[in-house]
Amino acid sequence: MGDMPYSKKINPKTKAIVAIFVLVIIGVIIGYVISIFSLEIIITELNKLPIQINPVRIDRSINYYTGALICLGIEITFLIGLLYVYTDSFLKTKSRFLIGLNMFIIALFIKSLLSVFSLHSIANDYIRVSPYVSRTFLTPGFNELNFVVYTFEIIALGILLYLSME
């Protein structure tokens, strides 16, 4: 009666959904923490400006910046999850196809990491270079269109992770 073999196995679909949910939570936390630390530097640079910028525009720019870093955090955690799944599969099967997938995932991972650094660099440099022209600090390249692209990337990686874990 106490021996139920099916109770010890988790359904692969459930396992995939739980893993994706956990990776999203971890990605949100990572992106938010990175944004908190990098925004301190950006706000310090912003406070050095000789002009006064509308606080509403600053808040909007901070929200765009934080949202972009959260999206990148989710992408990074999904890519780590995919790398784990494909590396595990490669170790079991020794398939050359999985080597190619791992290389592709590593390239996307490096792109996402560099995007985090470039977002911070763009924001800092933009404050220093053109404070009088823009009157805000994150206008170039930071708008709703970025979040559409990030959303599609996250959905695509989530689907790939789900199908790979199933």
Each model region followed by its residue ranges:
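Hydrophobic cores of alpha-helical transmembrane segments in multi-pass inner/ER membrane proteins
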Residues: 78-79, 151-160
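Alpha-helical transmembrane segments and their immediate interhelical/interface regions
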Residues: 55-84
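Hydrophobic alpha-helical membrane-insertion segments
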Residues: 21-32, 100-117
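Alpha-helical transmembrane segments and their helix-start/interface "positive-inside/aromatic belt" motifs
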Residues: 3-23, 95-105, 158-162
